[in-house]
């Protein structure tokens, strides 16, 4: 007999729409004593079967649903099918863009809640962020080793969200032999250095690939200020597209050193590139006070809101930084601005940037709305998967 989670009356509606989360507030009772991460069946208050997922006693999300098919067992074959499907769905993109770095599995949006897997050359980097993902760790490694025998497998489960699942932060080699860092990946004919051990997230921001390429349309012969540049890839694309000058700004010495390395491995002269180790907010205010201006500014900040309680503060932060950036733009200049917080609705982000233009005393036109690259799909039943929002604004 399976372990069964019965929901309170009326709490089945989201599962009927195939949303994969069951919150603790919706649970009526539990039949059995599930281990953390163990597979459980979820039923409506009237006993109707709804889904099968992983139990988490520590999290507010107490079940993350693996399948809505009553006949589908959660076993090694299940994970093999889901991972193979995820790879198959990305094959055309890999060929088209010449990718050696891409997101292989995007958690809930690929039907594998809590499991993120990125490929960098011949290394697969896993983040196992839920109790269920952690429970099936050995099975996942076995499946990946079978389907990608050429790849080492490395874990970067050093994300605070694991604490909400009652799990420790973990990093380390899971399979094979890790090559020397940095790895070199390619996208759109451009080489990028990635350190999967010390880099942000799994090592790099693959989700901005299309936006980096698109930015090249605006920069030929222009001065570019690339804020929160990390390893300088917006600047790298700008250099390739013929920007007259580029300033890469980040607080990390290591990131800026990698930005220099990225220019070198692409055979690009960086005499027209400067690297500023600085707090972006302070530097933008300094430049405003000095009367400095630019043709193009990129704002790609880290996440400002990790939870709903932080959203109001995040709104103020986004408004402030976009206002100052607009004040630094020459008339007719271009602002590329992003939010990577899943809690920030796209319409609210656009309103914040519009309000920033008013406060800056500038006229602005939105000419592009941007999102994450297509190897970061958004599940139709999981709108939370739409986390990266971007705008291109022409500022007068």
Curated annotation (Swiss-Prot):
It comes from Shewanella amazonensis (strain ATCC BAA-1098 / SB2B). The lineage of its organism: Bacteria, Pseudomonadati, Pseudomonadota, Gammaproteobacteria, Alteromonadales. It is an enzyme of class 2 (transferase). One of its GO terms (molecular function) is rRNA (cytosine) methyltransferase activity. Residues 2-79 form the PUA domain. Its EC number is 2.1.1.191. Specifically methylates the cytosine at position 1962 (m5C1962) of 23S rRNA. Its main location: cytoplasm. Belongs to the methyltransferase superfamily. RlmI family. This is Ribosomal RNA large subunit methyltransferase I. It is found in: Cytoplasm.
């Amino acid at each position: 007999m399976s372990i069964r989670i019965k929901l309170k009356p009326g709490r089945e509606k989201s599962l009927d729409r195939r949303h994969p989360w069951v919150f603790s507030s919706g649970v009526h009772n539990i039949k059995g004593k599930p281990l953390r991460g163990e597979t459980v069946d979820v039923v409506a208050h009237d006993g109707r079967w709804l889904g099968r997922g992983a139990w988490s006693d520590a999290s507010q999300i107490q079940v993350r649903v693996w399948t809505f098919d009553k006949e589908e067992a959660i076993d090694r074959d299940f994970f093999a099918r889901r991972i193979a499907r995820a790879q198959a769905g990305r094959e055309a993109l890999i060929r088209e863009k010449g990718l050696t770095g891409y997101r292989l599995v995007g958690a809930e949006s690929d039907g594998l809640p809590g499991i993120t897997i990125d490929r960098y050359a011949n290394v697969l980097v896993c983040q196992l962020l839920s109790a269920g993902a952690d429970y099936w760790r050995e099975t996942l490694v076995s499946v990946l080793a079978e389907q990608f025998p050429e790849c080492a497998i490395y874990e970067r489960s050093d994300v605070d969200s694991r604490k909400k699942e009652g799990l420790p932060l973990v990093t380390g080699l899971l399979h094979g032999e890790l090559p020397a860092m940095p790895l070199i990946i390619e996208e759109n004919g451009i080489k990028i250095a990635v350190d999967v051990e010390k880099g942000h997230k799994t090592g790099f921001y693959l989700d901005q690939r299309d936006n980096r390429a698109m930015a090249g349309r605006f920069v030929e012969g222009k001065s570019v200020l690339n804020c929160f540049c990390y390893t300088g890839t917006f600047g790298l694309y700008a250099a390739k597209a013929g920007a007259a000058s580029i300033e890469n700004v980040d607080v990390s010495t290591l990131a800026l050193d990698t930005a220099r390395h990225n220019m070198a491995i692409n055979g690009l002269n960086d005499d027209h590139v400067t690297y500023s180790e600085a707090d972006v907010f302070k530097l933008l205010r300094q430049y405003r006070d000095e009367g400095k201006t630019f043709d193009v500014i990129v704002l790609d900040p880290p996440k400002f809101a990790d939870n709903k309680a932080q959203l109001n503060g995040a709104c103020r932060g986004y408004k402030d930084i976009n206002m100052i950036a607009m004040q630094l733009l020459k008339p007719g200049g271009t602002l590329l601005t992003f939010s990577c917080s899943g809690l920030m609705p796209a319409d609210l982000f656009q309103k914040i940037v519009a309000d920033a233009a008013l406060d800056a005393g500038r006229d602005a036109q939105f000419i592009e709305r941007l999102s994450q690259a297509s190897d970061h799909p958004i599940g139709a039943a999981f709108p939370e998967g739409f986390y990266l929002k971007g705008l291109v604004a022409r500022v007068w």
